[in-house]
Amino acid sequence: MSKDLDKEDILYKKRHSIAHVMAEAVLDLFPNTKIAIGPPIKDGFYYDFEFKKQITEDSLLDIENRMREILKTGSSFEKEIISVEQALEIFKDEPYKIDLIKNFDLQNEVSIYKSHNFVDLCRGPHVENMNKIDPKAFKLTSIAGAYWRGSEKNPMLTRIYGTLWNNEKELRSYLNLREEIKKRDHRKLGKELDLFSIHEEIGPGLVFFHPNGAKIRALIEDFWREEHSKNGYDILFTPHIGKSWLWQTSGHLDFYKDSMFEKIEMDKSDYYLKPMNCPFHIAIYNTGKHSYRDLPFRWAELGTVYRYEKIGALHGMMRARGFTQDDAHIICTHSQVLDEIKEVLRFAIYMWSKFGFSNPKAYLSTKPDKSVGNDSDWEMSLKVLEETLSDFEVPYEIDKGGGAFYGPKIDLKIVDSLEREWQMSTIQFDFNLPERFNMTYTAEDGKEKRPFMIHRALLGSIERFFGILVEHYGGAFPLWLSPVQVVIIPVNNIVEDYAIKVFNKFKNEGIRIKLDNSSSRMNAKIREYQAKKIPYMFIIGEREATEERISIRTRTNEQINGMKLDEALKFILFKIRDKEI
């Protein structure tokens, strides 16, 4: 239900207006508080404050109540255009507003909005008056810290988040979804299901996969390798570290150094942990001479990279400092570009489908003001990307001028079961690195030419994709991805021999199966394995043992009684081999 809103959308205006109402309520309840900025955002709004005494979430209800009192006045939101000098006078006691104003051209005018007893430096837009806002359709949701202007060098402010919708029903729907998102948080489920951990004392942003999580990751990676081999890719392995000349040549030290770990001095040379895999693949390409007959090369790697993310930006598996990228680079001729791009998109859509995702949306980024490469290559590559999206009927938006300086790209996004949009795949032309590393091939006319290079990732970071899967399925992974697929629960010792026979029969077929012959009560076992999200429980009693059958209980409490053993095996194997979602 969440989406980015246009500034002229009524909900955008309502959220902008309620942020002003919240600021007034805060100033009423906490005099001498300093105000910073308060924009509408996806799903709601926020406002940043500097409090004399830090508040807690216990204060949110009081602020909400005061906001409703202000809304009852029905006051108008009135825009005024004033000079910069007037603005400096009005906000003379507001240091953060003064900081904003001082960045304005002194010859220009600025706009302010007045509502009830509040004045704010603001471009708008807003609703006409407070009667347009349903007082039952908003809620303050959380408090967080935020540096002024996003810089750690500046003061830490208190950010109050809220959400607002058109009516109470929409609000309730959103809050219910928010609760479900909390329940499915991959950090919470990662602990409950023993999937992974992060140890701050060892290093923030570094992910440790436990046996259950490692099994799922191995299944993802095995499937990835198998499908890439089927689709004409060769698998590469490259080092985690490289000398500084490599990163200087690639341009990373000039343009990406802030996101790299500090250099490592060794053997009188400087080394860096790799933030990307591309230069290593180019190094392999440049080990020999290539003819047009050799192309295209499709080289793929599950390459672990390291990027310095600020502590505050880290978020479990979704934003880590060490992660494995499902990178590939396609090196081809001009005439091969269209077919290669189409094949990448087809492959991406297929891969997502096996994990339960469909109906992608694309964002096509075009040439920025500053760029490398010639105009004809840019025009050709953009045309190829647009044609490919149209052929596959993928809806897309154009991000004009939003491309990297070295080439246009497509970002492909999917929507999960919680209605959230995730960027999954990137298809990126690169007119920069082939030039920097002097990549060539011998063309049909015998001349040396520059190949086209296409970067692509289908799943992105394996860690991030893992986290998305955890939340998408709420930890209840499809059968083929579940670390334990079946648990056998014998009802008593009399049937233990048959239970062992069933266990061995399924295990020999490669099914990940567990036999629980502990003394715990059967109902307690069922509850335990349902909580662990095990897909199937085989309940074996004396009748099942006598007739060589099993009774099946699912993690969602469905039951299939008295299925023949061989039929049960076929049933499970089919679901696994078909990768049924």
From Swiss-Prot:
The keyword Membrane does not apply. Binds 1 zinc ion per subunit. One of its GO terms (biological process) is threonyl-tRNA aminoacylation. It comes from the Bacteria. Its EC number is 6.1.1.3. SMART domains: tRNA_SAD. It is an enzyme of class 6 (ligase). GO terms for molecular function: ATP binding; metal ion binding; threonine-tRNA ligase activity; tRNA binding. One of its GO terms (cellular component) is cytoplasm. Keywords: Aminoacyl-tRNA synthetase, ATP-binding, Cytoplasm, Ligase, Metal-binding, Nucleotide-binding, Protein biosynthesis, RNA-binding, tRNA-binding, Zinc. Zn(2+) binds at residues 278, 329, 455. It catalyses: tRNA(Thr) + L-threonine + ATP = L-threonyl-tRNA(Thr) + AMP + diphosphate + H(+). It is found in: Cytoplasm. Catalyzes the attachment of threonine to tRNA(Thr) in a two-step reaction: L-threonine is first activated by ATP to form Thr-AMP and then transferred to the acceptor end of tRNA(Thr). Also edits incorrectly charged L-seryl-tRNA(Thr). Belongs to the class-II aminoacyl-tRNA synthetase family. Homodimer. This is Threonine--tRNA ligase. The lineage of its organism: Bacteria, Pseudomonadati, Spirochaetota, Spirochaetia, Spirochaetales.
